[in-house]
Design a protein with these regions (language model features):
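An N-terminal boundary/leader segment
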Residues: 1-57, 288, 350
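Short helix-loop capping/hinge segments that flank enzyme active sites or metal/cofactor-binding pockets
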Residues: 4, 76-96, 253-258, 311-366, ...
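Glycine-rich, small-residue loops and helix-cap segments
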Residues: 23, 34, 78, 84, ...
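Acyltransferase
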Residues: 24-32, 64, 272-297, 321-327, ...
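Acidic/His- and Gly-rich active-site-bordering loop/insert found
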Residues: 56-58, 66-139
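Glycine/threonine-rich flexible loop motifs
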Residues: 94-103, 271-272, 386-392
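Short glycine/serine-rich loop segments
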Residues: 108-229, 404-415
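A short helix-breaking turn/cap at a secondary-structure junction
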Residues: 191-276
Length: 415
């Protein structure tokens, strides 16, 4: 049946769905092309901790059978999807990037995974994560340069999409675990607003910071996967008003767009070439019709964002991973031990004050958008290109400011 000239594994999800619906290719042919690519390059990229081609093909054939029998299919229509190895999967191990959980199979699907399956997405396997989705990296390398980091913690998901193994993958972000890998690997990465995607069945590190996120090679694919994963219905009044009802969403041609260029308190840590690139990009945006662009500064309170994040994050890790630290200390990294021990030194009062400061950031950014009627903020995703080596600590960037503040963040690979 295959008639498209483009290698199928290089199709975006939206393109693949169009080809499948048009009868030009089958879901199985798409999956076979992705499997071939995985077999060709996985030994170099090391993006997968679990992959079973037979399971993937069975899922694809089920979708084709539904199509052939005239049964309606879900939004994903047979598209292959990678799942970060901190989401429960009923039929695959979930090891959280740690030997402590080697071979653990939870026997149920995380809500996000269930939504993917219900939309007839093909769950290909589990992608590499850093240890407990924190700092200590897995084995994945950057597809653009094997001697450089792909970014943590959603490294496998970003690398699998960037290297054309799959068109879509889900990850998480508690600081910069999606925006940073997406930037380093040169693809789209999206962390929606806090709470927009259910976290049931996902590894917990901190209730007020953990976000579900995802990766793609096109902006249309982000929109597609958001509609698959997000909450819906009248039980979520704001979502129901502005997302379920598309008339409540500002459209591309609804001019003018008001955009803020924000350097953020960590601008000084960015490489000069990164600063020059975004300033050049912003100058081009400023010349576009229908866009009003202003350079603004966040309040001085945001100078404390990184300290606040470290304080509440380390404290939460010391609580949630007490069992691993006390009973499996020989199986956890020195880096993770250091985080837990740092958290143990944070008092309850200090933790609560940290949460109060986070709440201040949330309200200040809400006020910032409402008062000034900004539609978007443009800023650097990272401080520069992917650093050399897997164990290099990245320079401070603004990612965690947006995570702390619960606002959506997206990496656009535009320069």
């Amino acid at each position: 049946m295959m008639v498209t000239l483009k290698p199928l594994n290089m199709l975006t999800a939206t393109e693949a769905i169009s080809e499948i619906k048009g009868g030009k290719i089958t879901a199985t042919e798409l999956m076979e092309s992705c499997i071939k690519r995985i077999q060709e390059i996985e030994h170099k990229i090391k993006a997968w901790v679990y992959f079973d081609k037979e399971k993937a093909l069975i899922q694809s054939k089920i979708v084709d059978k539904k199509i052939n029998e005239g049964i309606s299919t879900g939004l994903l229509n047979g598209v292959p999807v990678g799942v970060k190895d901190i989401f429960n999967t009923a039929d695959m191990p979930t090891c959280m990037g740690s030997p402590v959980w080697d071979g653990f199979t939870p026997g149920n699907d995380a809500r996000a995974v269930a939504y993917i399956r219900w939309a007839d997405g093909v769950v290909v396997g589990k992608t590499v994560t850093s240890e407990f989705a924190v700092h200590y990296p897995g084995s994945t390398v950057n597809p653009n340069d094997y001697e450089h980091t792909p970014g943590t913690s959603s490294s496998g998901s970003a690398a699998a999409v960037a290297s054309y193994m799959i068109p879509l993958a889900i990850g998480t972000q508690t600081a910069g675990s999606t925006i940073r890998p997406a930037s380093y690997c040169g693809i789209y990465g999206f962390k929606p607003s806090f709470g927009l995607i259910p976290r049931t069945g996902m590894l917990k590190t901190l209730d007020t910071l953990d976000h579900v996120s995802f990766f793609s090679r096109s902006i249309d694919d982000l929109h597609l996967l958001l509609n698959v994963l997000r909450v819906k219905g009248s039980n979520y009044p704001y979502v129901h008003k502005y997302l379920d009802n598309s008339s409540g969403i500002k459209q591309v041609n609804d001019y003018p767009w008001k955009v803020a260029f924000v350097k953020t308190p960590v601008w000084c840590h960015a490489e000069e070439y990164a600063k020059d690139s975004i300033i050049d990009f912003v100058s081009k945006i400023d010349k576009c019709d229908g866009i009003n662009l202003e350079e603004i500064e966040l309040s001085e309170d945001f100078n404390l964002a990184h300290d606040v994040h470290e304080q509440i994050y380390s404290k939460a890790l010391s609580y949630y991973y007490k069992e691993e630290y006390e009973n499996h200390i020989d199986k956890i990294s020195d880096m993770f031990k250091e985080m837990v021990e740092k958290g143990r030194r944070v008092s309850y009062d200090e933790y609560m004050k940290g949460l109060e400061k986070q709440n201040l950031f949330i309200h200040q950014l809400d006020y910032f958008f409402d008062k000034n009627e900004y539609d978007a903020i443009i800023t650097l995703s990272t401080a520069g290109d992917a650093p050399r080596g897997l164990y290099t600590r990245e320079k401070k960037d603004s990612c965690l400011i947006w995570t702390l503040s619960h606002v959506p963040a997206i990496n656009l690979p535009v320069f």
